[in-house]
Amino acid sequence: MHNPPHPGEVLLELYLNPLGLTITAAAAGLGITRKALSELVNGHTNVSRDMAIRLAKAFPHTDIRLWLDLQSQHDAWHAEQRAEAIDVKPFAMPPMETTV
């Protein structure tokens, strides 16, 4: 799997730029600070549930799940990249019972 884009990058490239929205104007429309939106589009903060709601309301052809899924995919990829560096001993699991 490739490195999924940060949702802030998606927001900037597919929504804000094509609409000609500045960070200041978009932040005002979303009801958040310019700093908060700038941090999101620059990948310095994640899409929260509240932000996903705001984005879905601001861009009606999207939905809350889209924004949260974008964040989840981005997070999962980065976690997978770190997995080998984390040393953990697996627990022995009891055998699974089969039912017929």
Predicted regions and their residues:
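Short alpha-helical DNA-recognition segment
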Residues: 20-38
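The DNA-recognition helices of helix-turn-helix-type DNA-binding domains
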Residues: 33, 44, 62, 71-74
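Short, basic-rich loop-to-helix N-cap that marks the start of a DNA-contacting helix
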Residues: 44-57
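Short, charged recognition helix plus adjacent turn
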Residues: 65-100
